[in-house]
Amino acid sequence: MSFAGLLDFARKDVDLPQNSPNELLKDLHANFINQYEKNKNSYHYIMAEHLRVSGIYWCVNAMDLSKQLERMSTEEIVNYVLGCRNTDGGYGPAPGHDSHLLHTLCAVQTLIIFNSIEKADADTISEYVKGLQQEDGSFCGDLSGEVDTRFTLCSLATCHLLGRLSTLNIDSAVRFLMRCYNTDGGFGTRPGSESHSGQIYCCVGALAIAGRLDEIDRDRTAEWLAFRQCDSGGLNGRPEKLPDVCYSWWVLASLAILGRLNFIDSDAMKKFIYACQDDETGGFADRPGDCADPFHTVFGIAALSLFGDDTLESVDPIFCMTKRCLGDKQVEMYY
């Protein structure tokens, strides 16, 4: 790590380069994603097999948000995703890999984006998800038994998108989520765990799907999220951590679900997001000057969509998909 990097780590923030981009380089990012999809012999592509379906969702969603989905290889991608389906009803990250809730949701989202969800078996998928709900209302991500509030959102989102939400024990799921609600207004991975921006997104998203946002103090949760903004304008995941462009999405989307987007400095936030763009290769990095990747690219673009960038499709804050492709699957939220 450079001396400047050590200083950034010590003060838990970064400086934005003076020559940072001051607008969204949308076409450059679309080229970055398109090349990433086509360059299947690259080291980074090969080493990402363990999360391939999630990576496909990130790339496809970034292109859909950028109004350039037609550049993607629809038939090839849909067939690959369908090839990740297992006999238990779930989807793995790649063909031959075990099923997991994270990849099952990403598979469903990708098929919806390509208007191919009818090729999936909604009943077997929802039964797979139902089988991972525990007696206390929580969900395991797979048969390994790991419990995490991320998996509650994955479960409710998957079944909602398939029109099978009633398959799950929603009351029990909500009770578990509320056991993870901390006095500071945040949520952790499990009861008693530290509050984290990503977990807040998962929990408020799940509560919104369940129609139970009234269970929490929205202002208190929004205030915890607002304090994640650093002097650079970026957002971090929890106190004393560096800002990261992916939290632009987790925090902003949570605030949007809560109806509290005005709790942060949007102009400063946009400057940070713009500064995380690679103006040579395209794509977004976690922080200015780092290497771009599809994960940070989709969430950087999605965050800018939440701010109303009219060059982008409008994004749904719960599902991180375009409102256009969701149609009547969007969740009504009342404030």
From Swiss-Prot:
<keyword id="KW-0677">Repeat</keyword>
<dbReference type="GO" id="GO:0018344">
    <property type="term" value="P:protein geranylgeranylation"/>
</dbReference>
<feature type="repeat" description="PFTB 5">
    <location>
        <begin position="266"/>
        <end position="312"/>
    </location>
</feature>
<keyword id="KW-0808">Transferase</keyword>
<dbReference type="GO" id="GO:0036499">
    <property type="term" value="P:PERK-mediated unfolded protein response"/>
</dbReference>
<keyword id="KW-0862">Zinc</keyword>
<feature type="repeat" description="PFTB 2">
    <location>
        <begin position="122"/>
        <end position="163"/>
    </location>
</feature>
<dbReference type="GO" id="GO:0004663">
    <property type="term" value="F:Rab geranylgeranyltransferase activity"/>
</dbReference>
<dbReference type="GO" id="GO:0031267">
    <property type="term" value="F:small GTPase binding"/>
</dbReference>
<comment type="similarity">
    <text>Belongs to the protein prenyltransferase subunit beta family.</text>
</comment>
<feature type="binding site">
    <location>
        <position position="246"/>
    </location>
    <ligand>
        <name>Zn(2+)</name>
    </ligand>
</feature>
<comment type="subunit">
    <text>Heterodimer of an alpha and a beta subunit.</text>
</comment>
<dbReference type="InterPro" id="IPR001330">
    <property type="entry name" value="Prenyltrans"/>
</dbReference>
<feature type="repeat" description="PFTB 4">
    <location>
        <begin position="218"/>
        <end position="259"/>
    </location>
</feature>
<keyword id="KW-0479">Metal-binding</keyword>
<dbReference type="GO" id="GO:0005968">
    <property type="term" value="C:Rab-protein geranylgeranyltransferase complex"/>
</dbReference>
<dbReference type="InterPro" id="IPR026873">
    <property type="entry name" value="Ptb1"/>
</dbReference>
<dbReference type="InterPro" id="IPR045089">
    <property type="entry name" value="PGGT1B-like"/>
</dbReference>
<feature type="binding site">
    <location>
        <position position="244"/>
    </location>
    <ligand>
        <name>Zn(2+)</name>
    </ligand>
</feature>
<feature type="binding site">
    <location>
        <position position="296"/>
    </location>
    <ligand>
        <name>Zn(2+)</name>
    </ligand>
</feature>
<keyword id="KW-0637">Prenyltransferase</keyword>
<feature type="repeat" description="PFTB 1">
    <location>
        <begin position="74"/>
        <end position="115"/>
    </location>
</feature>
<dbReference type="Pfam" id="PF00432">
    <property type="entry name" value="Prenyltrans"/>
</dbReference>
<dbReference type="GO" id="GO:0006888">
    <property type="term" value="P:endoplasmic reticulum to Golgi vesicle-mediated transport"/>
</dbReference>
<feature type="binding site">
    <location>
        <begin position="196"/>
        <end position="198"/>
    </location>
    <ligand>
        <name>geranylgeranyl diphosphate</name>
    </ligand>
</feature>
<feature type="repeat" description="PFTB 3">
    <location>
        <begin position="170"/>
        <end position="211"/>
    </location>
</feature>
<protein>
    <recommendedName>
        <fullName>Probable geranylgeranyl transferase type-2 subunit beta</fullName>
        <ecNumber>2.5.1.60</ecNumber>
    </recommendedName>
</protein>
<feature type="binding site">
    <location>
        <begin position="238"/>
        <end position="250"/>
    </location>
    <ligand>
        <name>geranylgeranyl diphosphate</name>
    </ligand>
</feature>
<dbReference type="InterPro" id="IPR008930">
    <property type="entry name" value="Terpenoid_cyclase/PrenylTrfase"/>
</dbReference>
<dbReference type="GO" id="GO:0008270">
    <property type="term" value="F:zinc ion binding"/>
</dbReference>
<comment type="function">
    <text>Catalyzes the transfer of a geranyl-geranyl moiety from geranyl-geranyl pyrophosphate to both cysteines in Rab proteins with an -XXCC, -XCXC and -CCXX C-terminal.</text>
</comment>
